[in-house]
From Swiss-Prot:
GO terms under biological process: mRNA processing; RNA splicing; tRNA processing
Localisation: Plastid, Chloroplast
Organism: Uncarina grandidieri (Mouse trap tree)
Annotated gene: matK
Domain of life of the source: Eukaryota
The keyword Chloroplast is assigned to this record: yes
Gene Ontology molecular function, alphabetical: RNA binding
Keyword RNA-binding tagged: yes
Principal location class: plastid
GO cellular component, one term: chloroplast
Functional description taken from the UniProt entry: Usually encoded in the trnK tRNA gene intron. Probably assists in splicing its own and other chloroplast group II introns.
Phylogenetic lineage: Eukaryota, Viridiplantae, Streptophyta, Embryophyta, Tracheophyta
Stored InterPro entries: Domain_X, Maturase_MatK, Maturase_MatK_N
This protein's name: Maturase K
Family the UniProt entry places it in: Belongs to the intron maturase 2 family. MatK subfamily.
Keywords, sorted A to Z: Chloroplast, mRNA processing, Plastid, RNA-binding, tRNA processing
Length: 506
């Protein structure tokens, strides 16, 4: 972002938040390419240079506006595959530029916010594991959780309208609206049943940005309610009767206050101090210390408000209210729950002694072994029952290369699931990968696993079999027994910014 700020001069267009001139700037697409969008379809298929030139971008935009879709039928894409390939080419290149440009105002705002709050290591806040220490500190004191699967918007126009509040450039929004509508139309001619899924896969960065900006709009209701609930907790009921405008705003938002006499009865809905909200991708969680009736009211109020103002249709089967004490929450590749940890304390007063039974709530995180085995079976590391199988590999791959690939997968899973309370499930996953690697090598050499290991020795798999704990104590040979005990407990890392593909059970 510092490089972008050097290129972005304070011109008159940028002072008014105009982003359309940036679409025709050469360095924008160079930055977009360098940021890891991957090689474009143009550079892969047609042999052009990796960097999208300004002339190519201008031609693509002109062709979009001049394209006559009434002369195109689904049979044309079958007879002329070059047309379908060009369609994906247009969307890929333009979406890369769009995704990079629309992120600029948000990135600049984030940088100024972090500098104002003097947050140095902001990358630690992006870690997925940073959510779990928050859950450990707060969820053990809560009772019920509202599990919500957020639906996608019914139309792409809703995404553009949401972005309009942040980007004040009508020309950029018009081009974005035209691109989204025309691309969906093109794709529906080729693959009618997979238009939206194909769009999200080929233009993942742009789609995620538009979707997250839309979700953040209706998540702002929690900020409003939190601020007002903080005010309500420090305000007497006599003063509240005079705040007609405030109650009118609350009534419009959540339909709580219907009559003046209902103020005292319904005030507790927005006074609840222990309401916590977290979200990752399409799954959001709302946890509270209140009762089941309290959570049902929140469900009705919030869902009604979101559907009315943001055109989101929440299916009743996608919203669950569960009690934390007897329900496991599947979130970010973990099964999280709050369980009672019984403990017995012996107390003695003079000659009399007695036992005191204490039950302490403890936040527990486990590795979901069944979905994880299903993910391994999907990529042919084992069968559906969890029995390791060999993977077909190319004959030109060396043994060390095969071991390195298996070992990297094992270390990544161990790294991501290091916060598990029980390591037994994780050890089983390591066993599956270890034996699958051995069977793959034996299959390559046309031998059995036992004969292969006996002939080459177990030192061949030494690097693969080494666990993270062994690596830790090889790095720090004088480690104490206290640190060894700490390692066996849960560890959350602050360098994980994406969920592991195998841990993402979909």
């Amino acid at each position: 972002m510092e490089e972008i700020q050097r290129y972005l001069q304070l011109e008159r267009s940028q002072q008014h938040d105009f982003l359309y001139p940036l679409i025709l700037q050469e360095y924008i697409y160079a930055f977009a390419h360098d940021r890891g969008f991957g090689r474009s379809i143009l550079s892969e298929k047609s042999g052009y240079d990796n960097k999208s030139s300004l002339l190519i971008v201008k031609r693509l935009i002109t062709r979009m506006y001049q394209q006559n879709h009434f002369l195109i039928s689904p049979n044309d894409s079958n007879q002329n595959p070059f047309w379908a390939r060009n369609n994906n080419l247009y969307s890929q290149i333009i979406s890369e530029g769009f995704a990079f440009i629309v992120e600029i105002p948000f990135s600049l705002q984030l940088i100024s916010c972090l500098e104002g709050k003097k947050i140095v290591k902001s990358q630690n806040l992006r870690s997925i594991h940073s959510i779990f220490p928050f859950l450990e500190d707060n969820f053990s004191h809560l009772n019920f959780v509202l599990d919500i699967l957020i639906p996608h918007p019914v139309h792409v126009e809703i995404l553009v309208q949401t972005l309009r509040y942040w980007v004040k450039d009508a020309a950029s929004l018009h081009l974005l609206r035209f691109f989204l509508n025309e691309y969906c139309k093109w794709n529906s001619l080729i693959t009618p049943k997979k238009a939206s899924s194909s769009f999200s896969k080929r233009n993942q960065r742009l789609f995620l940005f538009l979707y997250n900006s839309h979700v953040c709009e209706y998540e702002a209701i929690f900020v409003f309610l939190r601020n007002q609930s903080s005010h309500l907790r420090s305000t007497s009921s006599g003063v509240l009767l005079e705040r007609i405008y405030f109650y009118g705003k609350i009534e419009r938002l959540v339909n709580v206050f219907v009559k003046v006499k209902d103020f005292q009865a319904n005030l507790w809905l927005v006074k609840e101090p222990c309401m916590h909200y977290i979200r990752y991708q399409r799954k959001s969680i709302l946890a509270s210390k209140g009762t089941s009736l309290f959570m049902n009211k929140w469900k009705c109020y919030l869902v009604t408000f979101w559907q009315w103002h943001f055109s989101l249709w929440f299916h009743p089967r996608r919203i669950y209210i569960n009690q934390l004490s007897n329900h496991s929450l599947e979130f970010l590749g973990y099964l999280s729950s709050v369980r009672m940890n019984p403990s017995v304390v012996r107390s003695q007063i003079l000659e009399n002694s007695f036992l005191i039974n204490n039950a302490i709530k403890k936040f527990d995180t486990l590795v979901p072994i069944i979905p994880l085995i299903a993910s391994l079976a999907k990529v042919k590391f084992c069968n559906v029952l969890g029995h390791p199988i060999s993977k077909p590999v190319r004959a030109d791959l060396s043994d060390s290369n095969i071991i390195d690939r298996f070992g990297r997968i094992c270390r990544n899973l161990s790294h991501y699931h290091s916060g598990s309370s029980n390591k037994k499930s994780l050890y089983r996953i390591k066993y599956i990968l270890r034996l699958s690697c051995a069977r793959t090598l034996a299959r390559k050499h046309k031998s059995t696993v036992r004969a292969f290991l006996k002939r080459l020795g177990s030192e061949l798999l030494e690097e693969f079999l080494m666990s993270e704990e062994d690596v830790l104590f090889l790095t720090f040979p004088k480690v104490s027994s206290t640190l060894r005990g700490v390692y066996r407990s849960r560890i959350w890392y602050l360098d994980i910014v994406a969920i592991n593909d195998l841990a993402n059970h979909k």
